[in-house]
Amino acid sequence: MILYLREQLAERIRSGGFGLGGFLTPTGIGTEVAKGKEVITIDGKDYLLEKPLKADVALIFANKADKNGNLQYAGSENNFNHVMAANAKTTIVEAREIVDVGQMDPNFVHTPGIFVNYLVKGA
């Protein structure tokens, strides 16, 4: 098992979803976490290179979706759903409400439909 802070895990997922090569962090330098990881020194300060993570499948929940898969979240749904949708090869969304295209204000779309492969009506 590999232990990560929630923020490090989220950033590794975000890096994978948006095609980044990873990110640098000083967190973990001089601890067990640093073993086996590349250390990069910038201006005399050491950083660990945390490589990106990719998911095969993401199962996420949205408050509202249109039939093109554009998603709106409510409350804590905003945390990592958009990041996981961008990261996964296949994204399956359960939506509380599914509306016709054009019935959602585009200014409030949190995840564009391009990241959604399957849409299911939920409870």
Where are these regions (language model features)?
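Conserved alpha/beta enzyme-core scaffold
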Residues: M1-A123
